[in-house]
Amino acid sequence: MKKKLLAGAITLLSVATLAACSKGSEGADLISMKGDVITEHQFYEQVKSNPSAQQVLLNMTIQKVFEKQYGSELDDKEVDDTIAEEKKQYGENYQRVLSQAGMTLETRKAQIRTSKLVELAVKKVAEAELTDEAYKKAFDEYTPDVTAQIIRLNNEDKAKEVLEKAKAEGADFAQLAKDNSTDEKTKENGGEITFDSASTEVPEQVKKAAFALDVDGVSDVITATGTQAYSSQYYIVKLTKKTEKSSNIDDYKEKLKTVILTQKQNDSTFVQSIIGKELQAANIKVKDQAFQNIFTQYIGGGDSSSSSSTSNE
């Protein structure tokens, strides 16, 4: 899931280990000083109400529940492949990036594994809901491949200047893309890219504008959300090829299935409902009042006691 389900590992002592020491024992000494000590139990009592500590316990619970239910269905190679992609992306900075996030390679692997287990659970439920109605809705919203040339710029005034040149008679749009575009993936190929309505390579605003163009038409400047917070990027699009949409839904059945499943994976409400059902099925019992509310985002509030109860035993 493009959205990370679990928060980055926290550099607190294991909440579970500390909890085991919280009843009937002060546990081991963590810190000693002249005339005093800080014990595991004392530390646990201090940190258990901390939101970060509560998130750790929530993550640990989700990890254990989904590992038990789906662990045998997930190949370790999927986790290793994701790690390899991240190493390729960050290069020699990978360990530093992990450290800054409070993670080691092993905790990152565990995080990725849990995310993939949740994705697997979501996929299973979503596939069971692949109704004719769902396919029809996806088909109605689907636009097949178009090929376009795009120019991406970071400055609106610059974009307006380039647009004027792009709309001039005899303009060489490909050369304008090579000379001006900030999109390194497409500029050397004259800005050419092929995408459909399900593609994620270009922003929604750009796709919408491209689909509305006739072949050889050039858009106005399109403003889209940038990759940095509160930033914008500016696009100019020339449509070079448009695929006629078939009226036969069966021609797109596999593509539509992928579209529907991807939408479900990106639907936070749907994902939360799946996590909630698995937590309920696991019959979770909260043993410390400090943690009684950590599951409410998944299994509701005070009336969820039938599946997640608090016990002082």
From Swiss-Prot:
Q: Which GO terms describe its cellular component?
A: plasma membrane
Question: What EC number(s) are associated with this protein in UniProt?
Answer: 5.2.1.8
Provide the protein's localization: Cell membrane
User: What membrane topology is annotated for this entry?
Assistant: Lipid-anchor
Where is it mostly found?
A: membrane
A Pfam family: Rotamase
The chain's coiled-coil residues are none
Establish whether keyword Iron-sulfur is in the entry. no
What chemistry does it catalyse, as a reaction equation?
Answer: [protein]-peptidylproline (omega=180) = [protein]-peptidylproline (omega=0)
Which GO biological process entries does UniProt record here? protein folding
**According to the UniProt entry, where is the signal peptide?**
1-20
Name the InterPro entries on file.
Foldase_PrsA, PPIase_dom_sf, PPIase_PpiC, PrsA_foldase, Trigger_fact/SurA_dom_sf
Q: What does this protein do?
A: Plays a major role in protein secretion by helping the post-translocational extracellular folding of several secreted proteins.
Quote the protein name from its UniProt record: Foldase protein PrsA
Q: Which organism is it from?
A: Streptococcus pneumoniae serotype 4 (strain ATCC BAA-334 / TIGR4)
UniProt lineage:
Bacteria, Bacillati, Bacillota, Bacilli, Lactobacillales
Q: Which gene encodes it?
A: prsA
